[in-house]
Amino acid sequence: MHRFFKSEFFNFEFIRILSAAPYGGAEIAECLVAAGQITNDDPESWHRAWIIQADKAKALGDEALHSGDTVSARRAYLRASNYYRASGYMFHDRPGAPDARVLPLAQQVLDTYALTLPLLDTGEASQLKIPFENHQLAAYLYLPRDRTKPVPVLLSLGGADSIQEELYYVYAASGPQLGYAVLTFEGPGQGITLRRDKMHMRPDWEVVVGRVLDFLTAYMQQNPSVQLDLSRVAVVGASMGGYYALRAAADPRIGACVSIDPFYDMWDFVRNHVSPALLNAWNAGWVPSRVVNGIMSMAMAASFQAKWEVGLAMWFFGVDSPTQTLRHMMKYTLARADGTSRLDQVKCPVLVSGATQSLYLEPESDVLRVFDALAHLGDERREIWIARSPEEGGLQAKIGAIGLVVQRTFRFLDQHLNVTR
């Protein structure tokens, strides 16, 4: 496949932005101009290139709206929102390495995206706030315009680095046109809850989704006109969002689950990228944390991708050192301490996918392990899809093949939620 950048990381993230083009989140020429202004592995040039395109698209949206052209305004605002997201993507704002640009850029995404909501032609959209412990989770509810009967609901979960405004370009742009209500939200460690509210990540996503389902029940009672069919609720997520979806699927109120390119055990992921001998010695107490921190700090100094990945994990876990991050990663597993799998609690149909050209995961050690742990469902209620080439969904999270993953997801959901067209 054609490469835009020497860096695998920058190349993947650029394709990620291009992937939003069919759904209004990018314009090809704008992206190519930005690419020409970006220096490989230079986060500052990445930021500058995308902020220029974001500001231009925002100005085009304002101009179109002023002249009454709501179609062009919607398209421009969607692009601007995605470009603002991209402009801040390489930055973190953790206590040990603060960056004052992070929150203002996140707010620009929110403000610009809010301008698109009344202009969307894919259905109705509204902003919600979901009570969760001592906080409120920001959410969007996307509804089909034609709701003569109750509609099934899809909960679209973000992952480690996505924000819910980006999720629009996947399921929220298509779901309402196919007769689904789609709810996106940001839980602990995600999006604005991390950047503004300083909520850090947690592994027990069944608790988070459980509160969301409680909220939807109350919301439906107070707003019956939304016509949500809470007997037909599905959950979908990609990468870490795929892990979250599998955790959430243990809730009996979930009627179907689509887990795109998940991991089974985050610690196994670490062992595939860091010397297992070193990790075992450290975990056994034979090698002190300061030594491991020093080794990982050298790796971060030598590679921007490593610096970004470890820095992001420290940020969303709320810790200050690589070894503290490793301790947190051990908690993110579908295995119980006794060796059994949490997936034995899942009773709903599950579609799980893998990507052989993933930037991060190995399908054989993750997706097949998930699929095998779902054997109790029987082959009629579990499905596996391992994609090998980029156009078939072979990149992580099916980046570059959004239309295909949307088609396969809703085909699976239609079948198991009894949706007919």
Swiss-Prot record:
Its EC number is 3.7.1.-. Pathway: Secondary metabolite biosynthesis. One of its GO terms (biological process) is monocarboxylic acid biosynthetic process. One of its GO terms (molecular function) is hydrolase activity. The active site is at S239. Disruption phenotype: Impairs the productin of oxaleimides and leads to the accumulation of a trans-decalin containing alcohol intermediate. InterPro entries: AB_hydrolase_fold, FrsA-like, FrsA_esterase. The keyword Hydrolase applies. Keywords: Hydrolase. Signal peptide: none annotated. Gene3D superfamilies: acylaminoacyl peptidase, alpha/beta hydrolase. It comes from the Eukaryota. The keyword Cell inner membrane does not apply. Induction: Expression is positively regulated by the oxaleimides biosynthesis cluster-specific transcription factor poxB. Hydrolyase; part of the gene cluster that mediates the biosynthesis of oxaleimides, cytotoxic compounds containing an unusual disubstituted succinimide moiety. The first step of the pathway is provided by the HR-PKS poxF that serves in a new mode of collaborative biosynthesis with the PKS-NRPS poxE, by providing the olefin containing amino acid substrate via the synthesis of an ACP-bound dec-4-enoate. Belongs to the AB hydrolase superfamily. FUS2 hydrolase family. Homodimer. This is Hydrolyase poxO. It comes from Penicillium oxalicum.
